Curated annotation (Swiss-Prot):
Complexes and interactors: The Tol-Pal system is composed of five core proteins: the inner membrane proteins TolA, TolQ and TolR, the periplasmic protein TolB and the outer membrane protein Pal. They form a network linking the inner and outer membranes and the peptidoglycan layer.
GO terms under biological process: cell division; protein import
Name of the molecule in the record: Tol-Pal system protein TolB
Role of this protein: Part of the Tol-Pal system, which plays a role in outer membrane invagination during cell division and is important for maintaining outer membrane integrity.
Extent of the signal sequence: 1-19
Length: 419
């Protein structure tokens, strides 16, 4: 189901509206071969091993090597090296009173089992999955030199329909799609979730009062704050990198325009002007500019607004519809929703310009959101007539679907790194 912003653009510009376990759908051959030895046979040990394997698979940087003895046994580093593993993770789980002790080692199988990393943790039973993600982060950073993204989270909108009624919920889950928790539930639409830079709050659009309003909500406490409630459109909130401002879309003066809201004082400043529709603002990571979607050129395209002098320049020229654009955190690429021949796919363009390359090809993809390490793009798509979430690498060489939930899942947003 395409979101309302897309539908609005299509209606205004064309007069029409176009309407689990991790599943790897495409991989790469250059991934680092790694073996995950069993952490033990009990439920906690098996969950830790499964989560680590899932995490490293999601990253697109690793190829999992299976041992000869099955999932619940440990093999020697030399044996796993013979099977093709360059690195081996081995762990153990023990019960210590009412706590769980988890230890792991990362060995270099190429260098005769040289220990690269070894750590021990004590946790409560409800922290098993979180610790597994942390171990994945440790392994990933040790072997790649980059910070892992497995302890980050994702937000999305879940829609369940029963007869003529719909139930909307703003949910937060682990980066692998597991452990979902509902922050908000409503019989009216919820849209456009966006994480604050510190990962503690999410801004969103609610229609609970039969009109659009922008709120923020605390991820920890659920406490809400009303940001805007003007007549007409209140939409597409996006946080500034310092977390002190929200860029929003308001139609209180007529045509939808982009405004800046100071979250401390509540004061507002209009950023775009003219008669065209301007929407979907996204700050650059350095805070110097905004990307936004506008019809000022005749069709929805991506533009850049310099916050220093207000100058606007067009970014996209390829295709008849480009929208929902955002920079990757490293500012090397711009990821966007790209339409050609009535097919909606996720596209990527170098920040300096050039052609747009498709990362996905289903024709029903939307709402791209980039991981904090700039390597992966989370997006919404359709699979077996349901809304699901997919992940694609920034080079398009690895694609996968996240665990399916009941109902339709849409409008995902990837959190920043969480402390």
């Amino acid at each position: 189901m395409f979101n309302r912003i897309i539908s609005l653009f299509l209606l205004l510009f064309t007069g029409q509206v176009i309407a689990l376990d991790l599943e790897l759908t495409q991989g790469i051959n250059s991934a680092l071969p790694i073996a995950i030895n069993s952490f033990g046979s009990d439920a906690a040990a098996q969950e830790i091993g499964n989560v680590i394997e899932n995490d490293l698979t999601i990253s697109g940087q690793f190829k999992i090597i299976s041992g000869p003895q099955g999932a619940n046994s440990q093999s020697s580093v030399s044996t796993l090296r013979q099977l093709g593993a360059d690195s081996v993770v081995t762990g153990r789980v023990n019960q210590v009173g009412n706590r769980i002790e988890v230890s792991f080692t990362l060995a270099d199988a190429v260098a005769n089992g040289n220990i690269l990393l070894t750590k021990t943790f004590q946790i409560n039973a409800n922290q098993v999955r979180a610790l597994a993600h942390h171990i994945s982060d440790e392994v990933y950073q040790k072997l790649t030199g980059e910070r892992g993204i497995f302890s980050t989270r994702i937000a999305y909108i879940s829609v369940q329909r029963n007869g003529g009624r719909s139930r909307y919920s703003l949910e937060v889950a682990d980066a692998d799609g597991h452990n979902p928790q509902s922050l908000l539930v409503s019989s009216e639409p919820i849209m456009s979730p966006s994480w604050s830079p510190n990962g503690k709050s999410i801004s969103y659009v609610s229609f609970e009062k039969k009109k659009a309003e922008i709120f923020t909500v605390s991820v920890e406490t659920g406490q809400r704050r009303l940001i805007t409630s003007f007549p007409g459109i209140n939409g597409a909130p996006a946080w500034s990198p310092d977390g002190q401002h929200l860029a929003v879309v308001l139609s209180k003066s007529g045509t939808p325009k982009i405004y800046d809201v100071d979250l401390s004082s509540g004061s507002m400043k209009q950023l775009t002007f003219g008669n065209s529709i301007d929407t979907e603002p996204r700050y650059s990571p350095d805070g110097r500019s905004l990307l936004f979607t506008s019809g000022r050129g005749g069709s929805p395209q991506v533009y850049r607004l310099s916050l220093a002098d207000g100058q606007i320049s067009r970014v996209t020229f390829e295709g008849n519809y480009n929208a929902r654009a955002s920079y990757t955190p490293d500012m090397k690429h711009i990821v966007m929703l790209h339409r050609e021949d009535r097919q909606f796919n996720i596209g990527v363009q170098n920040t300096g310009g050039g052609p747009i390359s498709n990362l996905t090809f289903s024709g029903l993809d939307e709402s791209p959101s980039v991981s904090p390490n700039s390597r992966l793009v989370l997006y919404a798509t359709r699979y077996q007539n349901r809304g699901v979430l997919g992940i694609v690498s920034i080079d398009g060489r690895i694609r996968m679907r996240l665990p399916a939930r009941e109902g339709d899942v849409q409008e995902p947003a990837w959190s920043p790194y969480l402390s």
